[in-house]
Amino acid sequence: MIISVDHGNKSIKTPNALFTSGLIVSEGLQGFKTDYICWNNKYYTLTEQRIAYLRDKTEDERFYVLTLFAIAKELERRKVPETLDPIDITLLVGLPPAHYEQLHSRFEQYFLRRREIVDFEYNGKYYSIRVSKVLSYPQAFAAAVTQFGTLKAHSVAYIIDIGGFTIDVLKLRSGHPDLAVVESFEKGVITLYNGIASKCKALYARILEDCDIDEVIRNQPTVLPGEVQQLIRTMTNDFLTEFYNFLRERGVDVSTSKCVFAGGGSLLLRGMIERGNKVAFPIFIEDIHANARGYELLYQSEVAANGQQ
């Protein structure tokens, strides 16, 4: 069984599921009706409070448990019955392009776990799985693959994947990667959230959550006072301006280049990017699951090329 998981610092995505990269661990069920997993005699529930940024997600067990949630949600979606017989899984994952060479081997082994059988309970259902193969792909390029039919018409374009903590930038020529520009910057929307929250607390003694900031950026109804809203908008515009200048220093001029924006951060910032009129040709990949779906397309292409099943 093929299961594709995009491990974001802000959220976990499969082709069909989306949830925050946050966990609470306890010794027993808490009595609330929430998704849970019992594994290794511990209970894990999802929370909207995301995990602090980890450049190397193999440092502890949390992203492994989040992956069990992702697998369980896909099994549930596909109506796979609970079973004590191990389900063999080929797991498709991704990493920022600039981190790929350094981290991909460790990342794959983290999930492979010597192909051991893993038993767990998900929302009262019992599953047994064995991750028999793990394949990793570059994020951003995977998202671009889902739009290859459109991108191959452009002689040069830049895919800009704005995630939770990283922004990945990849140059494309006729839809194919040009390794002259492969960058991953630790300047994702979590850094914006942290900056806004810190300044708001200092100036107005208010504690903001990510969702409070999202409401203002998206022009949604909010209970925040006007001065806080203005602070959020000003700092978000400054964040984008700084990012555009950062790109320009690296040879990417958004005022003259075709820029293809992907990732949840791009969708969050879309309105401000478009209203700012600093990006001449913005194209948005609206599917937040694009990387996860792209891993599947890349895997299918490899299978077809190798004549494997």
PLM regions: where:
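Short, acidic (Asp/Glu-rich) active-site segment that either coordinates a divalent metal cofactor
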Residues: 167-171, 181-182
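Nucleotide/phosphate-binding catalytic cleft detector across ATP-hydrolyzing
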Residues: 1-157, 176-191, 211-309
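Acidic, metal/cofactor-coordinating or nucleic-acid-engaging core segments within structured domains
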Residues: 200-203
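Active-site-proximal alpha-helical scaffolds that flank and shape metal-associated catalytic sites
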Residues: 160-164
